Amino acid sequence: MMLIGIDASRAAYPQRTGTENYSLFLIRALLKLDRENPYRLYFNQPPAPDLFPAAKNVEIRAMPFPRLWTHIRLSWEMAPRAPDVLFVPAHVLPLVHPRRSVVTVHDLGYLYYPQAHTRSARWYLQWSTSYNTRAAAHVIADSEVTKRDLIEHCHATPDKVTVVYPGYDPNFAPARDSARLAAVRERYPIPGTHVIYVGTLQPRKNLARLLDAFAVLVKQGRDVHLVIAGKKGWLYEPLFAHMHQLELEEHVHFTGYVPQEDLPALITGARAFVLPSLYEGFGLPILEAMACGTPVICSNVSSLPEVAGDAAILVNPHDTAQLAQALARVLDDDELCHELAQRGLRQVTRFSWEKCARETLAILQSVGRMR
C-alpha cells in the first residue's frame, strides 16, 4: 500500500468549470475504484460534507490560507508530512513536493492566444507549466494535442507524458422528465428555437465571431435564439457591446453561470450545441452535449476534432460564413440533427470517469514504485 495525496482544492469550488469538474469527478472515481490505498485530500477550505463519500481509507486535510495556498501552505504541509505519491489534478505543483509527484496539464492555450490572458497570467502560466513538466515524475495530458505541445514547447520527453482522456458527468443524458424540463425553462426563460453555448465568457471562446455568425441568421429572417450560459471571465465586456452593435438584444440570452444540475435539461432543449473556441485542451462541454443527444458544432482546431470524432460538424473558427452555414444546416435539416445525435451518443461511450480513474491510478502506482 502507498499513501496517495491529492490536491483537491479545486474540487470544492462553488462554481465549477472544466478543471474543477475534472478534479471533482476524477477524485470521486478514484475513491470508488481504490479501497486499498489510503488517500489524503488537501483543501484550502473545509469541503462540504457530501463532496466525497466517507470512507475508512480517506483523510480530509483542510488548511485555510489567504493567498498562494499551493506554493506556501501546501508546500509547508509537504515538508514534514509528504505522502508517498502526490497527485495534482490541475496544473500546479507546490514548490515543495515529494519526488514521486504526478500533475495533469490541461492545455497550453496561453501560447497560442496570449491576448486572452493578462501579461502577469501569461508569465505565470509559462513558468508553472515549464516547472511542472520538469519537476513532476510524470505528467498526464488531456489529449494528444496537449502532449505534443508539452514535448515541443516544454521539452518533455515522450515517455514522461501519458494521455488520459477525462470522462463526463453521467448525469448528462437526454432529459425526458417533462416537469424537470419545464422547471428549467421557467428558470431560464428562452423563447422558441435556440442553439446553446456553455462555458466561460472569455476571448479564447470566440464568442464575438459566434455573434457575427448568428447575426447572419437573424438577417435572413429566422426566428431563432442564442443562449450563452456561463460566468463572466476576463475581457467579457466587449462581448456585450458587440451584441448591441449587431442589434441582437432580442435574440441573444445570457444566463450567467448555470449550476451543473440544470445543464442537462438546458442542453437537451436546444436545437444544437456550439463551441467555436480558438483553442481547447480537451473540450469537455461537447461530450456533455453529445451525452444529452444534442447535435454539436465545434471548431476544427486543437483537441476538438480528437474528442468529437465523426460526431460533430467541424468548422474553421475564423470563418464567420462557415459557422453561419453550419448553424443553418442544423436548423433546417431534421435528418442531419438525428444522425448527429446518434453519432454523439456512440462517441461518448469512449469516455468515462471510471476509465480515466483506472488509467490514472495505474500511473500513480507506477510512480509509487519508483526508486
Task: Report residues per predicted region.
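Carbohydrate transferase catalytic cores enriched for Leloir-type hexosyltransferases
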Residues: 1-371
